[in-house]
Amino acid sequence: MDKQPAHHKESKMVITYDQRRPEIDDIIAIYQSSGIKRPVQDADRIREMYRHANLVITAWDGEKPVGIARALTDFSYCCYLSDLAVRAEYQHQGIGKRLIGEVKQAVGEQSMLLLLSAPAAMDYYPKIGMETVSNGFMIKRTG
């Protein structure tokens, strides 16, 4: 994926999107700023989360990572978007929507994209064109 600039109407900033992986400290900073609940106190666990992810799309303001989408996919049938996070000061500018779009483009039209939403974000995803599903199940983590 080439860097793809996006001009945001609310400011003169140019956000680029690509598959560079930020440093772990930068990922943790994005998580902390965004409000997403992840084990940010455990850098080794975050490192492992990214080591095993096979698709990561990032949003950059110059050399500063401002948003991230982490996914697990087979690139042919299904893609699980496990993380979507945008720094608080960059939210409400279309960056999250664009990150989801970049993930969908990377996995192709033949792949379904699914995610688990935080309760606070349940109203967000339908606004950007995602459907709510009720036929899912999970076994919660114990650690």
Where are these regions (language model features)?
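Hydrophobic adenine-recognition pocket in adenosine-nucleotide-binding enzymes
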Residues: 84-86, 121
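Short amphipathic alpha-helix that is part of the acyltransferase structural core
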Residues: 2-43, 136
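Alpha-helix N-cap/helix-start capping motif
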Residues: 21, 75, 118-119
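Conserved active-site alpha-helix within GNAT-family acetyltransferase domains
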Residues: 111-115, 119-142
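A conserved beta-strand-loop-helix scaffold within acyl/acetyltransferase catalytic domains
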Residues: 45-84
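Conserved acetyl-CoA pyrophosphate-binding loop and the N-cap/start of the following alpha-helix
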Residues: 90, 94-99
